[in-house]
Each structure stands twice: as C-alpha cells, then as structure tokens.
Amino acid sequence: MSKTKPLSADEISRLEALIGYEFKEKARLDRALTHASARSAAAGNYERLEFLGDRVLGLCVAELLFSTFRNASEGELSVRLNQLVSAESCAAIGDEMGLHNFIRTGSDVKKLTGKAMLNVRADVVESLIATLYLDGGLEASRKFILKYWQGRATSVDAGRRDAKTELQEWAHARFAATPAYRVDDRSGPDHDPSFTVTVEIPGVKPETGVERSKRAAEQVAATRLLEREGVWRKSPTGN
C-alpha cells in the first residue's frame, strides 16, 4: 500500500473555508479525504465514515423533504429522496466543491474511471458529512447538507412517481406484461456494495442500472427505460 502524506495545514484551512466549518479535530478531516488504497484502516481512511455519513445524509434530506413538501405522498417523497442521495448527486456536489483536488488515493484508484470513480467521489462527500457529525454534532452536518441540498430538493422532478410502479403500469397497458428485474452483478466490499440490475419486458430492449443498493439499481434501470421509451422526460439529475 502506498504511503500518503496527510493534508497540510494550508489544505485543511482551504477545506474548512469550502465547508464553512472549523474542525476541532483536524485529523478527522484528513481521514475523511483518504481512500483505503492510500492508507490502512488502522492508519486512517474513510471506509467507516462513509457508512455513517450515508445515514446522516438520508436523515437530514428526509427531514428537509418532509418539512418542505407538506402535501407530498410517501411515494413522492421517496422519489425525491432517492434522487437527492444517489451517488450521482453526491459526486456532483463534491465536484462543485472541488473536493477531488484534496482526495488522497493510491495508484490503483487513480486508474479508475466512470462509475467506479464516481463512487469514490460520492463516498468522500458522505465521509465528510460523517466527520462533521462526529466533530460538531447533527447541527453541523445538517447545516452543511442544507447548504448544498436545499436548492436541489426543489429542482428534482416533482411529478414523477415511483419508477418501478410507473414502468409496471406502462408495461401492463402496452404489452400485457410485467417487468422482470435481474441482478447481473454485485461487487465491492460489504459496507459499500455496487449492484448492477437489468429490467426486461418481452418485446422491449432491456435497460440496466448501477447503484449502491439493489432497490436503487432497480429504480435507475426502470427510470432509464421509461426515459428511453419517451414515457418520461429525462431527469434534471441525469439518473
């Protein structure tokens, strides 16, 4: 495993300015930006942090949606939540912040492209949220999440129903058939898996989705098929 230097004092100061929070324990910020390929868990990387950050993000975004869309059904709230906490959304926020300039990775990860690298960028955002939670409590992480997610909460497609439900009704009406979902691949560690799922309807070209849970991957696959067939317009988030 390659040896990676910790973040410098100048880099930490720049990160704190980007985040809008001054950390009590600076080492936590360094760990949040360090991939396992660059440093072991004992030495400090973000593998455990991303697990916690994912849960904190989900809670805060769910709370935001619950208070913002008071007349929305549970299904509508779930559609918004899935879009807002997806790997694509997290990675986009990390890119907007310029976090890729601070991520510590080993040589193996630097060769990654596409979905694999997108997951790394998303994981860093989640680990950063966990670090804020551990250093400053829920209020510190909530403040950060509101800063970057509040505007996006109203920009996702409010009119969309659950993609799987929409696809099933369309398939029944058009082909008298029920969509079938197949898990093609499961990769990655237990704490950060990646699922590849294909949805098939007789007489229709299949579509594939890749996400960090089987359910989310099914939603992505269903969404892509609906968009390709013109049932839905393309999502603003690009999912």
Swiss-Prot record:
CDD domains: DSRM_RNAse_III_family, RIBOc. Disulfide bonds: none annotated. The keyword RNA-binding applies. GO terms for biological process: mRNA processing; regulation of gene expression; rRNA processing; tRNA processing. It catalyses: Endonucleolytic cleavage to 5'-phosphomonoester. The keyword DNA-binding does not apply. Digests double-stranded RNA. Involved in the processing of primary rRNA transcript to yield the immediate precursors to the large and small rRNAs (23S and 16S). Processes some mRNAs, and tRNAs when they are encoded in the rRNA operon. Processes pre-crRNA and tracrRNA of type II CRISPR loci if present in the organism. This is Ribonuclease 3. It comes from Agrobacterium fabrum (strain C58 / ATCC 33970). The gene is rnc.
